[in-house]
């Protein structure tokens, strides 16, 4: 991995039946990675990791299309629906040996992705754990 001044970030996004919102929110997550990398806060090797949690719609197909369109998108697929927390855990376990920072966020766009800037800054300043609470 890198040092704290050039960390690799993985944004872990659990997805269950997200075919409607995924095409809207995925580019926002990618733009956040690109913006943070362009500002020198994270490594350009950072990724957006989608975890398909046994969706019954086109979610997994869309994740595969995204991954084929840009190397910064990656995805894993659970064989069946295991629940939100297990999907987050699966993503964290997948990412743990590939990055310095993991941030989990829901796919629906209800959380402020700009909060990631402060989280990355806190990590770069020496924090090992940073969390946000929606207000």
Regions found by a protein language model. Give the residues of each.
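Structured catalytic core of nucleotide-sugar glycosyltransferases
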Residues: 1-135
């Amino acid at each position: 991995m890198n040092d704290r001044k050039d960390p690799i970030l993985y944004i872990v996004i659990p997805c269950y039946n997200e075919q409607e919102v995924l095409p809207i929110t995925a580019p926002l997550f990618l733009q956040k990675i690109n913006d943070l990398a362009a500002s020198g806060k994270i490594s350009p090797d950072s990724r957006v990791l989608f975890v398909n949690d046994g969706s019954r719609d086109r979610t997994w197909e869309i994740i595969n299309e995204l991954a084929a369109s840009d190397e910064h998108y990656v995805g894993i697929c659970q064989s069946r629906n295991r629940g939100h927390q297990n999907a987050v855990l699966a993503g964290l376990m997948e990412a743990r040996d590939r990055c310095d920072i993991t941030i989990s966020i829901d796919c629906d766009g209800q959380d402020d992705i700009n909060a990631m800037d402060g989280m990355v800054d806190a990590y770069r300043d020496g924090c090992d754990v940073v969390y946000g609470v929606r207000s």
